[in-house]
Amino acid sequence: MQRLLLPISLLLVVAAVPAPAGIVQDVKASFSTGSDARAIQELTAYRAAQGITPEYLEAFSWLTRAEFESHNYAAAEKFAQGIYAQSTEMLKKRPLDREPHLPLALGAAIEIQAGTLAAQGRRSEAVTFLQEQSNTFGATSILPRIRKNLLLLTLEGKPAPPLDGIVRPPGKPALVFFWAHWCPDCKSEIPILSKIKAEFVPQGLAFLAPTQKYGYVAGGIDAAPAVETAYIEQIRRTYYTGVIEAPVKVSEANFTRYGASTTPTIVLIDRAGIVRLYHPGAMTYADLRAAVAKVIANPVGTNQVGTK
């Protein structure tokens, strides 16, 4: 589908519609149904009524994503730069993590700027940009997202970072499955992981499944660490019995180190400890099995599965 290419300034002159109550949800819904013009009207109406707010910037990031996914890289880069500039201006008066909208907006702006650079053959510039952003925002909630995008460009073919609290069996290939208790896509991988384990664990594959705490339990209810830890175990027993063994390894450091801001994130490490696959998001059985089979078949760890 061809996306509408509109500069940011034109968002001020599109015919207004009543300002929506949940601009992010409304804009996402409009894009999901192909109603690009409607999404732009919603953004315009919200800005006219509320001004440029963190919620507006997050909603606008969905327009930016749409341009990127349609390979309209010039527009995506311009929009992302605008979101970045507005976000960093707000940071002069407030911390990033005071509420959720600004981190999501800024994280998207960084992700899309790096993505447009890489997509246009400017990979080294993308890596440098992400390294700079990692240094700038290293003490904030968006660091894992920045690292995810950096690792997408750099991790495959490199030694696997160590895992906090987990020892990878030496000389064995390993499948690392980063999951979250709230994650529906993680649960959708259960049948796939069950088949992968049944076939390849007897052939020497190690299966590791770290997670982390998020500060809440079912329904988004705030939870103390001990309560959430117990809830994680409850989810494991309910959904992942036979796939994820107890005790579950819980560590925020692992998620930051591997940039696992997307769950699931799937990492495949060969016998020599080299990352051969780094995949934020769910995978099909066929794709995952093919990657694992190639690593298993290589006895010396020189397989080049997915290596960039």
Regions found by a protein language model. Give the residues of each.
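Short active-site neighborhood of thiol/selenol oxidoreductases, capturing the structured segment around
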Residues: 166-187, 193, 207-210
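N-proximal helix/coil linker or "cap" segments that precede and/or mark the start of modular domains
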Residues: 118-164, 226
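Flexible helix-coil transition and linker loops at the boundaries of alpha-helical arrays
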Residues: 47-56, 86-103
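Structural microenvironment flanking redox-active thiols in thiol-disulfide oxidoreductases
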Residues: 188-239, 248-256
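Thiol/disulfide oxidoreductase modules built on the thioredoxin-like
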Residues: 239-293
